[in-house]
Amino acid sequence: MGSTRDRLLPPMPVNVLWGWLGPLLVAVFGGILRFVNLGRPHAVVFDETYYIKDAYALLHYGVERASLGTTEDPIADRMLLSGNTDFLVKCTPPDADPCPLYVAHPPLGKWMIGVGEQIFGLNPYGWRFAAAVVGVLSILILARVARRMTRSTLLGCLAGLLLSVEGLHLVLSRTALLDIFLMFWVLAGFACLVADRDWARGRLVTWYESSPLSDQGPGLGLRPWRIAAGLCLGAACAVKWSGIFFLIGFAVMSLLWDAGARRAVGLREPYRGAFGKDLTSILLAMGLLPAFVYVVSWAGWFASPLGWGRNWAQATSQGPAFFVFDSIRSWLSYHMQVLGFHTGLASTHPYQSEPWSWPLLLRPVAFFYETPATKCGADSCSQAVLGVGTPVIWYGGLVALLTMIVWYVATRDWRAGAVLASYAFGWLPWFYYAISDNRTMYLFYAITMTPFMILALTLTAGLIIGRADAAPNRRALGAAVVGAFTLLALINLGWLYPVLVAEVIPHSQWWTRMLFRSWA
């Protein structure tokens, strides 16, 4: 029976202290990169112009509110950079046009940005604080989930280290955009499901060892890690709607894991067992619970008369039952308009790119660029924030993803399948919008793919190093190859670092860091 347990549930590394201390040290390193000079540049960077003001309005009104100025003349941006927070449009009555603001994304990511603004004030450090926190936490989570998937603390720390020095993750961890929060909740949901996989297999093996076999096996009861995954993925959808691709994909993947576990213990009807015994729990945990989280994220809109499309006077014109009915009707109408906006978003932008070009880093987004008068030892200086990944990691990641395809075809290893599927959930849906709608898209949308690309690199590193019982010379050579790659990634990040974090450097040095003309 022990062999069945070991086969279904390989033992975790025995050193629990290093299992936490190693990932924490890697996260601290990533935190230093993200928090040092977090308030630089002292400017409103790219789409921060929307989310930092929305976050401020949510803190004070519970809903987003219109601000002074336009895209061409951002009066509000200049006011808040000077410390003036009186930048919201005032209306009498307060729910009259144009004060209610139409927004295209759910509120949760902006509420998270608002936490930093509440603690540190409405300044660049304050509005970027939450992004940096979740960036560091995602390093820790990735290190821990990689450790669980590989049963190796060393490989877990490698995954965290690679995410620490991944350029796009670094930039988004230092910028108040929504995508870093989306990535965080997606990764957290994935980590919970991997933990649930182990938990469920442990329950199944215990049943197998102590009960007579049946064709389908038992129901596995309340599954806390699956519930946690539902909460996280509901939060992902409450940041951006693209979280739903992961919610659906992960739910199917988790159900297939259940069927695989039942097959592995020798049940004759594993799929009927999984669908018959586990489908209800997955619908609750990955269906109703995420929907509940999503609706709750709109609590400010439901509770305030000031939200766009709220129709408060109409909703309160009759009794409580009509209030609930009319509020839901207005909320759904709002969502239909947002859906129309997203499907028809085809305006051109100088930094837009197609999803098939993202893995090659062909067109990054210049979040910020100035030619400051500050002396930098040259006649012309540059200060830039370029939203681009670390090329060594991304191009190495392509090789690793191809390795995962070969590995999965050859062995059906669940880890390769999970990484490939998760990467696809963050990438392939955008092909539809690019082809059918010609939708405006950007490289930084690929941030949700990045943790799974790094997991592919980590699993490939494990294959290169070899099993613990492999010949010492073979493992030493593999470790040297992996170490050399990691060193190259560190050097590559160090080379790019000035144009990722807005250091003032000579223009010639900025230009040498533009790997392709399309980067400039």
How should these model regions be labeled?
Residues 1-33, 277-290, 420, 475-484:
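Start-transfer (signal-anchor) and selected internal transmembrane alpha helices
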Residues 8, 17, 150, 189-225, ...:
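Membrane-interface transmembrane helices that cradle and orient dolichyl/undecaprenyl
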Residues 20, 25-26, 142-165, 184, ...:
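Transmembrane-helix signature of polytopic, membrane-embedded enzymes
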Residues 35, 39-83, 279-282, 286, ...:
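Aromatic-rich transmembrane-lumenal/periplasmic boundary elements in polytopic membrane proteins
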Residues 44-45, 131, 171-181, 239-242:
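Short acidic/glycine- and proline-prone juxtamembrane loop motifs at membrane-interface regions
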Residues 50-120, 124, 207-218, 367-385:
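Interfacial juxtamembrane loops and adjacent helix segments
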Residues 129-150, 188, 403-404:
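Transmembrane-helix motifs of polytopic, lipid-linked glycan transferases
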Residues 217-225, 233, 252, 258-259, ...:
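Transmembrane helical bundles and short interhelical boundary loops of multi-pass, membrane-embedded
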